[in-house]
Amino acid sequence: MKVSASVKRRCAKCRIIRRHGIVRVICENPKHKQRQG
């Protein structure tokens, strides 16, 4: 899980999701998991 100021899709399968005010990226590839914070 990467915590970064700006979350970006790193591949076509990445999905940007907003949960409880936190922006997350979920993907099949675990290396692409990100969270904004």
From Swiss-Prot:
It comes from Thermomicrobium roseum (strain ATCC 27502 / DSM 5159 / P-2). Keywords: Ribonucleoprotein, Ribosomal protein. Pfam families: Ribosomal_L36. PROSITE patterns: RIBOSOMAL_L36. One of its GO terms (biological process) is translation. This is Large ribosomal subunit protein bL36. The keyword Cell membrane does not apply. GO terms for molecular function: structural constituent of ribosome. GO terms for cellular component: cytoplasm; ribonucleoprotein complex; ribosome. Disulfide bonds: none annotated. Belongs to the bacterial ribosomal protein bL36 family.
